[in-house]
Amino acid sequence: MATEEFIIRIPPYHYIHVLDQNSNVSRVEVGPKTYIRQDNERVLFAPMRMVTVPPRHYCTVANPVSRDAQGLVLFDVTGQVRLRHADLEIRLAQDPFPLYPGEVLEKDITPLQVVLPNTALHLKALLDFEDKDGDKVVAGDEWLFEGPGTYIPRKEVEVVEIIQATIIRQNQALRLRARKECWDRDGKERVTGEEWLVTTVGAYLPAVFEEVLDLVDAVILTEKTALHLRARRNFRDFRGVSRRTGEEWLVTVQDTEAHVPDVHEEVLGVVPITTLGPHNYCVILDPVGPDGKNQLGQKRVVKGEKSFFLQPGEQLEQGIQDVYVLSEQQGLLLRALQPLEEGEDEEKVSHQAGDHWLIRGPLEYVPSAKVEVVEERQAIPLDENEGIYVQDVKTGKVRAVIGSTYMLTQDEVLWEKELPPGVEELLNKGQDPLADRGEKDTAKSLQPLAPRNKTRVVSYRVPHNAAVQVYDYREKRARVVFGPELVSLGPEEQFTVLSLSAGRPKRPHARRALCLLLGPDFFTDVITIETADHARLQLQLAYNWHFEVNDRKDPQETAKLFSVPDFVGDACKAIASRVRGAVASVTFDDFHKNSARIIRTAVFGFETSEAKGPDGMALPRPRDQAVFPQNGLVVSSVDVQSVEPVDQRTRDALQRSVQLAIEITTNSQEAAAKHEAQRLEQEARGRLERQKILDQSEAEKARKELLELEALSMAVESTGTAKAEAESRAEAARIEGEGSVLQAKLKAQALAIETEAELQRVQKVRELELVYARAQLELEVSKAQQLAEVEVKKFKQMTEAIGPSTIRDLAVAGPEMQVKLLQSLGLKSTLITDGSTPINLFNTAFGLLGMGPEGQPLGRRVASGPSPGEGISPQSAQAPQAPGDNHVVPVLR
C-alpha cells in the first residue's frame, strides 16, 4: 500500500520499494535506514519484513533477478534490476533477503520433505538438465528418491507421488506389473504389461515402473484338501512341470504345505478329500488315465477303505454309496451294461449287455462298472391269508402267490390289480355289512383313508349268513362264497356289486354292497293306494324276508341269489303292485275294517290246492309266505305300520273323530280320578278323627293314674282325720275320672257312627253321579253314531240317485270340454295329468250337491254296528276282536 509520508523509517531486516516517477523505475531500499522521499518518488508500500528462510526450509521465487558469477544483482541501462521472467528459483536457508521489484514469492516458506525408510518419492523431470553427478536428465524421465533422506527440490523436477513399501509376510506374495520395459530389483528384464510375484519376506519398495496389483495370500493345504488350478497360459509351475493353457491339475500337501497361486494360475476352488469306509464304494466318471488325461465315457469303481482326491474332470456317480449287504431275505436285480464274466474258473458265468439276473444273500456285493443295480429286492412276508399278484415279464401271465414268503425272480414284477371305483370305495370304507347296514351313505369318514396297495391280493371278509359272488372273466364263470369266510380275488376275478334300493319310498341305486345278506331281516316301504271309491291312502309296510338256499354246493342254486341285482326294489315293486290291485277292488270302508287281511292276502296269495268246506264248496287257504323263485327270496310276514289318507279333508275328518274319542275318554278318566281322590280324602279324615279320640282316651287314662298316685301320696302323708278326708277326695276323683273316660268313649263311638254315615252318604252320591255321567256320555255317543249313520245313508242315496254314469260324466266333463277346445284350435295331442293332481270323485259328488265336508262316509260303519276293524268310535275301540283279525287304526301325521 503506497504511503504519502516524506520521512520513512525502515527498521532492520525490512525493505521498501521506491518508484521514480520520472524514469518509472523501481528500486529497493533496505533498512535500518531513515529514508526521505523526494517529490518525484513514490513509496509503493510500507516497510515490509525481508524473506527469512530457516534451516531445512525453502521457498520458491518466480521471476528471480539475474546475478553474475559473484552473486551480485545485475541491472539494465535504465537502472532497473534484470529479471528472469517465467523462471523459478528455489532458495534454501540463507540470510534474510528482500524481494526486488518484479519478484514474486510463489511458494511460501516450506519445510524440506523428509523421506523415511521404506518410502520413496516418485520424481519426474519437467526440463532437461544435468544432475550433480554430471548426468544428463531428459524431460519425461522418471526415477525414485528412496529414503531415508531429505529431498532438495529442483525447479526442473516434479514430485508425482509418495510410494510406500509393501510388507510381505510369510505365505504371502506381492503381485506386480511392469508399466513399461524395465529391470526389476532382481535384475530381470521385464516387458510392458508383464506380471510376476515377489515372495521375499519383508518390505518391498516397488521400482518406478512397477505397479502393485495386490497382495496374494497363500492357500494352506492339509491332508484333507487340495487346490484345483488352471493354467492361464503356457508356463512352468514351481515344480518345473510345463503347463499348457487351460490345463487343470491339483496341488496337494505332498507338493507344498502352502501354495501361492502364480500369476499364470487360476484358482478354481478347494477340492475336499473323498474318504471311503470299509462298507463304502464309489463310481468315478471320466477317470484320469496313466497319461494324466480323462478317459471320457469310462467308469472306475473304487472300494473302501481308501482316501483320494478327485482329479480335474472326474466326478462321482451318485456320490459315495454303501456296499450292498444282503441278508437271506434280500436280493439284487442286476443288468449288464457291457459283456462281462462273473465268477472264478469253472463257475464263470457270461452275461451279454442287457441281461438281467438276480443275486441273493447273504453276501456283500459291490457292482462293477459294467453292471447296473436295477433295484434291491426284499422277500415279501405273507401270512396264510395274504398274497401278492406276480406277473412274468416274458410271458405276461399274472398269478397270485398266497400264504408263503416270496421273493420275485429276475423275470417277475409286482402286478397292480385295478378295481372299479365303486368296489374300491366299498373296500376302503371298512364297514361291517351287518352291523353298519343302518348307517346312511352320506355319513363319510372325516379322516382320509389310506390308499390300497394294488399289488396285494384283494381279500374280503364275508360275514356270517351272507354271500359274495366273484366272477372270473378269463374262465367266464362265477363262484359264490358263503360266510363266515375270507374270499381272495384272483388276477382276473371281480366282485359282483349289488345296487339296492333304499329309503321310504324306495329309491333305486341308493345303496351299494359287495355281500348279500341272507336274512332274516326286514325292509320298509311306503306306497300309495286307491280304493274302489277313489279314496287315496298312503301305507307304510314292513316285510320280513330271508333267502332260501336248498343246496349251497349247487352252483346253479347259489347263482340264483345274484340273478336279481336289486332284490329289494324288485320285491317292493312286486308287492306294491299286488297290494294296489287288491285294494282297488274294495271300498274304503271295507279296507278300513279288514286292511290287515286284505294286504296279507294280496302279498301272500292262496294255496293252489283248495280244501272242501262242509257244504262242499271250495275254500282257498291263504299262504303264510311269498316266494320269489327268481332268486329264492321269501317274504314271511307283513307289518302294516301306518295308514294315512292322502286327501286333506278325509284326514281332517278322521282327526276330528279321533280327537272326540280321546276327549270323551279323557273326561271319563278325569271324573273317576276325582271321585277316587275325594274318597281317599274322606277315609283319611275319618282315620285322623279316630286317632284324635284314641289319643284323648289315653290322656285321660294317664291323668287317672296320676290322680290315683297323688291320692295315695296324700293318704300316706295324712293321718287321723286327714286320712278319711283324703280317701273321700280320692274316691271322688276316681269316680270323676271314670266318668270322664266313659264320656270320652261315648263321644268317640258317636263320632265314628257319624263319620261312617257321612262316608256312606258321599259314596252313594258319587256312584249316582258316575251313573249319570256315563248315561250322558252314552247318549252323546249314540247321538253321534245316529248322525253319522244318517249322513252315510244320505250320501249313499245321493250317489245312487245320481248314478255312476252321471258321476263319471261330471268328472270327465271338464277335461272333455278342454279337449274339444284344443281340438277346435287344431291341436293333435292331449296332456294327461299325473298322480299328483288326481280326479277326486269322492268329493266331486258333494260339490255337485252343494254339501259341505261333513258328509263323510262314516254312517256305513255305524250302521253296520261295532266291528273288529272299527277305529273311530269309543265303543268300537273297546269291543272284543275276533281271533286272527288285525285291527288297523289310521295314523295321522
From Swiss-Prot:
The vault ribonucleoprotein particle is a huge (400 A x 670 A) cage structure of 12.9 MDa. It consists of a dimer of half-vaults, with each half-vault comprising 39 identical major vault protein (MVP) chains, PARP4 and one or more vault RNAs (vRNAs). Interacts with TEP1. Interacts with PTEN and activated MAPK1. The phosphorylated protein interacts with the SH2 domains of PTPN11 and SRC. Interacts with APEX1. May interact with ZNF540. MVP 3 mediates interaction with PTEN. Residues 856-893 are annotated as: Disordered. GO terms for cellular component: cytoplasm; cytoskeleton; cytosol; extracellular exosome; extracellular region; ficolin-1-rich granule lumen; membrane; nuclear pore. The modification Phosphoserine is found at residue 445. InterPro entries: Band_7/SPFH_dom_sf, MVP, MVP_rep_dom, MVP_rep_sf, MVP_shoulder, Vault_2, Vault_2_sf, Vault_3. Gene3D superfamilies: 2.30.30.560, 2.30.30.570, 2.30.30.620, 6.10.250.720, 6.20.380.10, Band 7 domain (3.30.479.30), Major Vault Protein repeat (2.30.30.550). There is a cross-link at residues 444, 704 (Glycyl lysine isopeptide (Lys-Gly) (interchain with G-Cter in SUMO2)). MVP repeats lie at residues 2-56, 57-111, 112-164, 165-217, 218-272, 273-323, 324-379, 380-457, 458-520. This is Major vault protein. Disulfide bonds: none annotated. The modification N-acetylalanine is found at residue 2. It comes from Homo sapiens. Keywords: Acetylation, Cytoplasm, Isopeptide bond, mRNA transport, Nuclear pore complex, Nucleus, Phosphoprotein, Protein transport, Repeat, Ribonucleoprotein, Translocation, Transport, Ubl conjugation. The keyword Repeat applies. Present in most normal tissues. Higher expression observed in epithelial cells with secretory and excretory functions, as well as in cells chronically exposed to xenobiotics, such as bronchial cells and cells lining the intestine. Overexpressed in many multidrug-resistant cancer cells. It is found in: Cytoplasm; Nucleus, Nuclear pore complex; Cytoplasm, Perinuclear region. Phosphorylated on Tyr residues after EGF stimulation. Dephosphorylated by PTPN11. Required for normal vault structure. Vaults are multi-subunit structures that may act as scaffolds for proteins involved in signal transduction. Vaults may also play a role in nucleo-cytoplasmic transport. Down-regulates IFNG-mediated STAT1 signaling and subsequent activation of JAK. Down-regulates SRC activity and signaling through MAP kinases.
